[in-house]
Every structure is written in C-alpha cells, then in structure tokens.
Regions:
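Soluble "head" domains of membrane/secretory-pathway proteins
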Residues: 1-208
Length: 208
C-alpha cells in the first residue's frame, strides 16, 4: 500500500509517457515528508541503458529504502551506511554485514564500481563518500569534485549542457562558480545490497 498523500500526488501527461516522450511532472501539496528507512515507490529517474542524464520513466517503478534525506551527508564505511549526525541503523543491516565480510565480491558477479564512476574519487560499494545530498535552495561551490557529483542534477534542473573545461565549470555558455539547487534529492538503497540497482550505482533520486 502506497500513501501518495505524504508528498502529494503527481500530475503528468500520460499520453506523452506512453509515447516515450519527456514529461513534466507537477506534484500536488503533500501532508508530510519522508524519513530515513522509509520504503519509497518511485519512477526510475535515469535512462535504463545509460545513467549519465536524468529522464523520468513514469512507466517504470522501483521500490527502494530511503537512506539519506536532502541536506544529509552520506558515507559507506566498511560496507555500512552512515549519515553524519545520525546514529540509528540505516537500511538492511544483515545485507550490509554480508557485503562487509564478502571476499572478492566481483567474483560473485557483484559490481564493485559505483557512482559517479570517476577514478579520482576511488569510491566503491564498501567505501563511498562523503556525498552531500542536495536540498532545495542549498548552494555549493563549483569545482572539479562538485561537477563530477552533481552534473546530472544541474543539467536536469537547468536544461542546459554542463561541462568542466580548463579548470572551470561551464553551464551553457556561462561560467559557474556557485550553484543553488532548485530541487530536493534522496539516496536510496535496495535491501538486497548484493544485487540491487540503486543510488550507489545511478546516483541521487529527485523528489519529483
């Protein structure tokens, strides 16, 4: 049973969705907010064959657990989820414990590499982050690291090309030193962590 009243029902052009066209989603006012460890049902926000840009697939639903909220800073240490300033259990402890003890996970078909797939960060499924999860009206200084982490989100919000060139971030034709997010985002995880396509692999989930 899904309670759509928490964040508000969504309105979109179903005919455009059936024709595999981009859709604009309008969300009605909700009665509350999500909490860590809530189970979320959502549309997959990336193209299935490529995760480098956001495109809502309103005909495809995923079910995952909310690990981090807008404004949180998330890490994975030794295979266990951590949110700074939060001491309670996050996600499926048994699955995290299994992953933490597993020798050579790639030999079992587990994909070790993670979002944002950039060797300069060195992230993997057992050592990941810190990753600040953007919240609406939160600003970040734009540099190479924040470009790597947030380029999909910024390109989606602004509907413009973003690139890192000559040590600077360009949005369209404009130089960007700081960016203020227009949306809230979440980090979600499947309970079967050894076999789950979730935020560890494709990135952050837009609130829409």
């Amino acid at each position: 049973l899904v309670n759509k009243m928490i964040k508000g029902a969504r309105l979109f052009n179903v005919f455009a969705a059936l024709n595999n066209e981009d859709v604009t989603i309008h969300r009605m006012p909700g009665l509350g907010s999500f909490k860590r460890n809530d189970i979320l049902v959502f549309n997959f926000p990336y193209q299935e064959s490529r995760w480098d840009s956001i495109r809502m697939n309103v005909m495809q639903y995923y079910v995952k657990r909310c690990i981090a909220l807008p404004g949180d800073t998330l890490e994975i240490r030794g295979g266990f989820y951590k949110v700074r300033g939060y001491s309670e259990l996050l996600g499926n402890y048994e699955a995290q414990h299994y992953l933490s003890k597993l020798q050579h996970p790639e030999a079992r078909g587990i994909v070790v590499g993670t979002f944002p797939y950039d060797g300069s960060l060195g992230w993997n499924i057992r050592e990941f982050g810190p990753l600040p999860i953007p919240r609406k009206e939160q600003s970040v200084i734009m540099n190479h690291t924040t470009y790597i982490l947030y380029r999909q989100l910024i390109a989606w919000e602004q509907k413009k090309k973003i690139e890192f060139k000559d040590g600077q971030v360009l949005l369209g034709d404009s130089l960007v030193h700081q960016y203020c997010f227009k949306k809230n985002y979440y980090f979600v995880s499947g309970d079967n962590m050894a076999n789950s396509q979730d935020s560890r692999y494709w990135g952050m989930l837009p609130e829409e």
